[in-house]
């Protein structure tokens, strides 16, 4: 079976209602701007529909089409560590949440970052924290695997070798990912 780049939804993503009203249609658009690097896979270059619909039941505004997550994230190019503003924000966040978690637990602290990107957030945690990151993009290849346990996968896990990984964490973060759900 050939995997398609996108598919049309016929019911609300939240409540399942089938009455979806078109509110804006921007026709077909390129997914995102990408930097094409030498010896790297080319980004997806075909246009996909960009249409917003409104659920008549719960009023959720949502995309009419769902794009394949492989197309969206396998060749993702943005790295958190290259942006000073982002690094500063992530460091402040880690400082804040570390103080909170250290009041409850002083040792063996285990943290998970979903959508860990290049590991910038995880690198700000103290050395004695056990760090885990999940991200489907190739960017995780830059992370020092001696300092951070990395899963190059989607969350929840898609790869069979990761599906049996069961662990409780003291803290779970997920930055700049929820708008993709």
Question: Over which residues does each language-model region extend?
Answer:
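Conserved SAM-binding motif I beta-strand of class I
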Residues: 130-135
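Conserved SAM-binding strand-loop segment of SAM-dependent methyltransferases
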Residues: 146-160
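Conserved alpha-helix/loop element of class I SAM-dependent methyltransferases that forms part
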Residues: 85-107
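Conserved SAM/SAH-binding beta-strand->alpha-helix loop
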Residues: 137-139
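Conserved class I S-adenosyl-L-methionine
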Residues: 106-117
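A conserved beta-strand element that flanks and buttresses the S-adenosyl-L-methionine
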Residues: 173
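N-terminal juxtadomain amphipathic helix
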Residues: 1-85
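Conserved SAM-binding loop of SAM-dependent methyltransferases across substrates and taxa
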Residues: 118-128
């Amino acid at each position: 079976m050939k995997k398609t780049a996108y598919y049309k939804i016929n019911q609300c993503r939240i409540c399942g209602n089938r009455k979806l009203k078109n509110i804006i249609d921007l026709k077909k658009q390129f997914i995102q701007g990408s930097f094409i690097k030498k010896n790297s896979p080319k980004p997806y270059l075909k246009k996909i529909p960009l249409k917003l619909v409104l659920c008549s039941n719960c009023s959720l505004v949502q995309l009419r089409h769902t794009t394949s997550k492989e197309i969206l994230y396998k060749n993702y190019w943005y790295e958190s560590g290259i942006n000073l503003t982002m690094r500063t924000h992530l460091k402040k966040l880690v400082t804040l949440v570390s103080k909170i978690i250290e009041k409850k637990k002083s040792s063996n602290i285990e943290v998970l970052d979903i959508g860990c990107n290049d590991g910038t957030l995880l690198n700000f945690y103290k050395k004695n924290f056990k760090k885990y990151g999940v991200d489907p993009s190739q960017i995780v290849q830059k992370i020092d695997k001696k300092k951070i346990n990395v899963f190059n996968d989607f969350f929840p896990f898609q790869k069979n070798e990761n599906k049996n990984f069961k662990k409780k964490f003291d803290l779970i973060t997920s930055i700049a990912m929820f708008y993709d759900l």
